[in-house]
Structure formats: C-alpha cells, structure tokens
C-alpha cells in the first residue's frame, strides 16, 4: 500500500467537486513552499536536526523549492485576476534533497561532507516538480528567489 494515496485521492476528489460545483473558484496547488516561520517542512526540520548535531536526510529524491515570498506574489496576482482555474504554484527547477541539505549545512558553517543519506520513507515520490507553464502565462512571474538566497534567509530566521 502507498500511504500517499490517502493524501492524493481525497485531494483530487475535492478539487473535482469544487470545479463542478457551479461556484466561482480558484484552486492553487502549492509545491514545496519554504521560508521563515514555517514548520513541518524539510528545510526547517533539517535545520533543527543540524542544530542538534544530526546531519542526515531520509532519501535523496528531487523536489522543486519555492520561496514563500514568490508564492505570495504569484497568489496575489492569481486571486486578483483569475477564477475557475486550477493552477500549480511553485518553481520548475528540480534539486536533489542532498544538494539542499548541503547548502543548508554550508550556511550553518557545518562541513557538508558530514551528510548521511538514509533510506527514504515508503511511498515517497521520487520526484515532485510542478508544471508551471500556466502560472507563468497568467502571472508573468519568472523572477524567482535563488535557492541559496531563500535558504539563507530561512536558516538565519531559525538560528
């Protein structure tokens, strides 16, 4: 059994219900948004582990990371100008989790060679990267915060 089904199937059913309700709607699917103040996300959880001297990740899948300020700007444009759509908000650039972990370690002054890659969770997607064609067309947004800069701001907020 894949534990992700318990998340993705109800989500898809809910989106379908809303889209067929006859009401005005805007469904925004956020992909790996990170930034200061967030909890329960890889970046924040890894920083906390590093503060405890634990330098490991679970799996080395790929993800696209979107800094919170970028997600807010895209959302603002979408909400003000569009309806009756389902839109992915995120960044197209895919990065291995180990690369992100090593960047975080470098920002924290920890030798990235200390990183240990452990087995990942059962059922975890090997890659998670949105198709951002529609959000770019609708918002014109292309000025993403560079990953290194967003990570630096996030890490500094957690130290």
Question: Which sequence ranges carry the predicted segments?
Answer:
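Residue-level signal for the nucleotide or nucleotide-sugar donor/cofactor binding architecture
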Residues: 5, 38-41, 63-69, 95, ...
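Active-site helix of classical SDR
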Residues: 6, 10-13
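NAD(P)-dependent short-chain dehydrogenase/reductase
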Residues: 16-64, 68-72, 77, 103-105
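Short-chain dehydrogenase/reductase
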Residues: 31-32, 86-89
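PAPS/PAP-binding and catalytic site of the sulfotransferase fold
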Residues: 42, 71, 96-108, 150-154
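C-terminal "lid/loop" region of Rossmann-like NAD(P)-dependent oxidoreductases
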Residues: 58, 86-87, 95-101, 109-127, ...
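Conserved short acidic donor-positioning loop in nucleotide-sugar-dependent glycosyltransferases
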Residues: 92
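Amphipathic terminal alpha-helices
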Residues: 133, 147-159
